[in-house]
């Protein structure tokens, strides 16, 4: 489920995964891969880092696990007055992160006709930290 709210003119954006009934081992494994990919990307977020590096961290992990072709979008985007803003965390993005940026980190794996998993959180960059 993709959730969001607008408070004081600013957007939020997050996604959570859920299932009804028994969850098979492949879905549990895919969820774990996506969660680890998100953590890998979050570990790269800091001022001065190119957005493509955070994307690469998530994408390489998913690819190593055999699902590279099933990761069909960028890793994240800026959020603010608009729901989708700059900077963009994608393979080709040369944008550089800076203090004050608010970005989503939302890797996903999508297996058509079966299931998909995406985990999305927002991160606020300060000079010294990333706040989730």
Indicate residue ranges for each PLM-predicted region:
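Active-site neighborhoods and metal-handling regions in enzymes and metal-associated proteins
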Residues: 1-132
